[in-house]
């Protein structure tokens, strides 16, 4: 069964808790023995953010903290070794952990995340906009993908409905026309074309703040992301 590492927390000198996004059961927490030996059946080094695993575990619901029976990694080629990709992986893993914590399993969402990691890991250049494209299309699986096509210039963007409007909404969750003018650019991006869009560091930060605030409005109990500021600084 496929799984993706989202987070690890040291539980004791001998154990850690690993949070995995699993294909079958969504987000699960596992108690795992800390073992750095190369002969270990399951190595601690495999539990880096966005590492993809093939795992087997006892899925009985009575066990809140589960145990892995077996695990085999699909080694990452570049993400752990390129600082920009590592920073992006830390952010996306934290983002997925926050958004997926109470969500039911979704094979389509899992496939999207799995394939996106593959793309980032094998991409050699021009990936600075990857996290923006990833977050935009991830929203589709939650049912609130924004419509970023502006009907005319000088429109407001309603964060609650996820659409542009020529009339300013009465609620405060709105982007003014000058704040929303970059959104149609984001809508035109995908993994194949995003390298064609040359954004400044400030523009990229602005779009990231938009996506973060948009999710915060639509996901209950959306926590503050510790890695957000670091990501903004790296891609400024």
Predicted regions and their residues:
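Non-catalytic alpha-helical scaffolds and adjoining flexible linkers that form interface surfaces
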Residues: 1-236
């Amino acid at each position: 069964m496929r799984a993706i590492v989202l987070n690890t927390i040291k539980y004791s000198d001998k154990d850690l808790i690993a949070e995995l996004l699993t294909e079958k059961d969504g987000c699960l927490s596992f108690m795992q023995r800390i073992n750095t030996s190369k002969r270990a059946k399951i190595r601690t080094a495999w539990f880096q953010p966005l590492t993809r695993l093939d795992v087997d575990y006892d899925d009985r619901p009575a066990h809140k903290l589960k145990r892995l029976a077996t695990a085999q990694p699909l080694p990452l080629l570049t993400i752990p070794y390129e600082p920009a990709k590592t920073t992006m992986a830390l952010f996306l893993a934290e983002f997925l952990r926050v958004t997926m914590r109470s969500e039911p399993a979704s094979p389509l969402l899992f496939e999207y995340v799995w394939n996106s990691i593959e793309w980032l890991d094998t991409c050699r250049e021009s990936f600075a906009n990857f996290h923006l494209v990833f977050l935009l299309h991830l929203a589709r699986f939650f049912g609130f993908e924004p419509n970023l096509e502006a009907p005319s210039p000088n429109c407001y963007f309603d964060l609650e409905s996820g659409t542009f409007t020529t009339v300013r909404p009465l609620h405060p969750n709105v982007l003014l026309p000058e704040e929303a003018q970059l959104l149609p650019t984001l809508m035109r991006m995908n993994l194949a074309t995003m390298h064609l869009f040359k954004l400044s560091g400030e523009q990229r930060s602005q779009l990231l703040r938009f996506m973060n605030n948009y999710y915060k409005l639509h996901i209950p109990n959306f926590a503050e992301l510790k890695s957000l500021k670091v990501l903004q600084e790296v891609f400024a």
